[in-house]
Amino acid sequence: MRNYRGSKVVIIGLGITGLSCVNFFLDRGVIPKVIDTRIYPPGIKKIPHVVQCYLGAFNDIWLLSATLIVVSPGVRLDHPVLIEALKLGIEIIGDIELFTREATAPIIAITGSNGKSTVTQLVSRMARIAGWHVGVAGNIGVPVLSLLNKSYQLYILEISSFQLDTTYSLRAIAAAILNVSEDHMDHYPGGLKQYWFSKQRIYKNAKICVMNALDFLTIPIYHEYDYCISFGENEDSADYYLKYYKGHTWIVAYNEYVLNCSEMRINNRINYINALSALALSDIIKIPRSVSLKVLCQFSGLAHRCQLIYKNHGVSWINDSKATNVSATKEAINNLKLCGTLHLILGGDGKLADFSSLKHLIKQHEIHLYCFGKDGLLLTTLGFSDVILTNTMIQAMRIINRRIKAKDIVLLSPACSSLDQFKSFEMRGLIFTCFAREFR
């Protein structure tokens, strides 16, 4: 544990993470200063009067006179004043780093471009049913610092690349990278390579690394670790894998057939792969296999992830609002069983992503494309023969409702962030769900 008394602490960002950092330091007798570039950040009403706040821009004087700067996830570390602060020897960290300096229980750390929330929830349910007192937090809306001082036996953390960028002391008993694909390119000027390096940081000093055998970007390459376990579809390259046997797909662990996938509530490739990684992590901490398999069979999925939310007159409406990057959208489409036309809704803030890999879907499926939001116009250039540009998602849905016929599928899988028009991907998904259920 660190003693921060006497430190000149400046916190950047006053969302849920920033507020948790403020409380962390106040509990330790340190009064931090807070900066937020927004004029009215969401946590401003919860800040005690003793804490000075500077809103609307960075305060260079505060930052360059600090001894410790704590940044919220998503704050650009290449901002000139932060670069200058580093040159002056000022430490810049995030909430995960603060947490790891204090935590005394073992940590399972999970990251990836897609699927990390699902795997985090699976492993946490397995541990709880097995009798562990588990703290779950990170990039899932629960600030990790809120878990301190609660006598947990195990921490399971979902960690984003943004959080990993400012984490140095993580020593997980098991660290997993589920997959790596292009995302947040607006945040990483070095492109996919820089984003990949950020993800790799989770392996540093991990006891066991868990990697995706089908994704070479998840292979631990430059950090020390004790042991590596792999998961994937191919038995030739993975410790945990899928195998087709006697008419069924099975989950196999070290050549042992452990679960017929037909017993799982969600029967698709995405869920099977998530199950492999979750089982690998649960085995590492010796959760009884019977408990883990029970959870895998009962799991019905998380909201806004390829979720069938309405079916009427033979038309299925699917909410995949969590698909905030291209790879997630491709996975969603490839897992559909199409008998009619696919009405695909794309749009939002693409974060400087390359959408060109969606083009091959044109040849494989009958797709009508509806584009909206900040990058809607760009998405219309993908080469789809049937494409409509609208200002909003709701406008697109109303047009779709006039065109659909039996056996069609309406899929919201935007391949983009929601923040250009919505508070969150959850809000985008809820609005999609509400309007879909109004159509008759």
Swiss-Prot record:
Give the record's GO CC terms: cytoplasm
Q: Keywords for this entry?
A: ATP-binding, Cell cycle, Cell division, Cell shape, Cell wall biogenesis/degradation, Cytoplasm, Ligase, Nucleotide-binding, Peptidoglycan synthesis
Q: What is its EC number?
A: 6.3.2.9
Top class in the EC scheme: ligase
BP terms from Gene Ontology: cell division; cell wall organization; peptidoglycan biosynthetic process; regulation of cell shape
Where can this protein be found?
Cytoplasm
Q: Which GO terms describe its molecular function?
A: ATP binding; UDP-N-acetylmuramoylalanine-D-glutamate ligase activity
Superkingdom classification of source: Bacteria
* InterPro entries according to UniProt: Mur-like_cat_sf, Mur_ligase_C, Mur_ligase_C_dom_sf, Mur_ligase_cen, MurD
Would the keyword Cell wall biogenesis/degradation be found if you checked this record's keyword annotation? yes
In this chain, ATP is annotated as bound at: 112-118
Give the pathway listed in the UniProt entry for this protein: Cell wall biogenesis; peptidoglycan biosynthesis
Catalytic activity as recorded in UniProt: UDP-N-acetyl-alpha-D-muramoyl-L-alanine + D-glutamate + ATP = UDP-N-acetyl-alpha-D-muramoyl-L-alanyl-D-glutamate + ADP + phosphate + H(+)
One Pfam short name = MurD-like_N
HAMAP family linked: MurD
Q: Which family does it belong to?
A: Belongs to the MurCDEF family.
Q: What is this protein's function per UniProt?
A: Cell wall formation. Catalyzes the addition of glutamate to the nucleotide precursor UDP-N-acetylmuramoyl-L-alanine (UMA).
Give the matching NCBIfam families: murD
Name of protein: UDP-N-acetylmuramoylalanine--D-glutamate ligase
User: What is the native source organism of this protein?
Assistant: Blochmanniella pennsylvanica (strain BPEN)
Q: Which gene encodes it?
A: murD
